[in-house]
């Protein structure tokens, strides 16, 4: 089982080949391939390689599947004994990536 821990879009992810993951928005058109190079840990058939901080020569090839929006988060502020009520919502822009290959 090959997996890697990478840093992309300001978050660290545990990834495997052939699976898709949702990351913060990446400004790339759907259908295009991108290469993720910040690999922090690589496990290839039980052989673990740990980077300090990143591993040289290991790349992750991924394809952008689509752009989407995350679940709505609602924020409600209120001041007691006043008529102050504030309700706001936020939906995060996300990018769905399909991991094609992990090469070392």
From Swiss-Prot:
Gene Ontology CC: chloroplast; mitochondrial large ribosomal subunit
Record key words, sorted: Chloroplast, Plastid, Ribonucleoprotein, Ribosomal protein, RNA-binding, rRNA-binding
A GO BP annotation: translation
Coiled coil: none
Keyword Repressor recorded: no
InterPro entries in alphabetical order: bL21-like, bL21-like_sf, Ribosomal_bL21, Ribosomal_bL21_CS
Subcellular location: Plastid, Chloroplast
Domain of life of the native organism: Eukaryota
A Pfam match: Ribosomal_L21p
Record keyword RNA-binding present: yes
A GO MF term: structural constituent of ribosome
Subunit structure, interactors included: Part of the 50S ribosomal subunit.
Family membership: Belongs to the bacterial ribosomal protein bL21 family.
NCBIfam families: L21
Protein's job: This protein binds to 23S rRNA.
Protein's UniProt name: Large ribosomal subunit protein bL21c
Organism: Pyropia yezoensis
Gene that encodes the chain: rpl21
